[in-house]
């Protein structure tokens, strides 16, 4: 019988002998690995063991199968390994086997301990006395690679870096000093914090419309309430998001080239852009931009104020989305049915109903 186990308590050697006992066996071999008190001249206090439990037990059972295939006469096999902290002189691993003859027992135990060190994923850390640094390490006999074979060896390829403070201006994206950059970051964080606070007030704070409580000093933290949403396990309102620029909307996106040609004053349908340009050559480019930005055009208005309106429109579009208007403006799909119109039913009074019934009766008599 095979006895395989990872234990956190001290291993009882007497219990191991009981597991090996069998009337038909004339020999039992037991290997006990203990914690020694020194390593490379450093004082060892204890050993700490960790393992990948499921994989370790699987490999230990495979070792038992290998032992029985090589030595079929083996009766009982025991493989116990400690996990956690193991003080000095305590057993950390016990491997034992019983068989009718001593040669099978001795050879199988020697083979098992070598396979355990090689195949089972168990790591240990030596805890030293004093300020010596401890680290986790695997058995040196392990067949698992310590590092990827395809990893690049940076130590074999030294790289010399020449320090230079003259950086080309084309490679610099942010051309401000540290104080200005810190100020911008603080403003961004504060604005995001204000948005979150305002949303928390909307989602959590009740209005207390009919209450006489003074709310001048109240806040969302002290006045918050949780309102159960219908057909939902969440107390926050769930809103459907219309993803207008996702991958599923590729077919509904407009023709970018056509939109850009409109912006540049190219030919569009039956209109002649050169004819329009000859009519008002100084304002043609600005008029095209204003038309594309959906701004009202007034030729008598000052050109600087018109340019200012265009700049404000661009800033507005950039604040809404990094993409511009012609990237997100979608044409209505012909496959989609128009939303049903809400029809409000008319309420009839009693005299109106009586008059309507009377008309029906008169019509039937006439027929």
Curated annotation (Swiss-Prot):
Heterotetramer; composed of 2 small (Mocs2A) and 2 large (Mocs2B) subunits. Catalytic subunit of the molybdopterin synthase complex, a complex that catalyzes the conversion of precursor Z into molybdopterin. Acts by mediating the incorporation of 2 sulfur atoms from thiocarboxylated Mocs2A into precursor Z to generate a dithiolene group. Keywords: Cytoplasm, Molybdenum cofactor biosynthesis, Transferase. The gene is Mocs2B. This is Molybdopterin synthase catalytic subunit. GO terms for molecular function: molybdopterin synthase activity. HAMAP family: MOC2B (MF_03052). InterPro entries: MoaE_sf, MOCS2B_euk, Mopterin_biosynth_MoaE. Its EC number is 2.8.1.12. Pathway: Cofactor biosynthesis; molybdopterin biosynthesis. It catalyses: 2 [molybdopterin-synthase sulfur-carrier protein]-C-terminal-Gly-aminoethanethioate + cyclic pyranopterin phosphate + H2O = molybdopterin + 2 [molybdopterin-synthase sulfur-carrier protein]-C-terminal Gly-Gly + 2 H(+). It is found in: Cytoplasm. GO terms for cellular component: ATAC complex; cytosol; molybdopterin synthase complex; polytene chromosome. Belongs to the MoaE family. MOCS2B subfamily. Substrate binds at residues 101-102, 117, 124-126. Gene3D superfamilies: Molybdopterin biosynthesis MoaE subunit (3.90.1170.40). GO terms for biological process: chromatin remodeling; Mo-molybdopterin cofactor biosynthetic process. This protein is produced by a bicistronic gene which also produces the small subunit (Mocs2A).
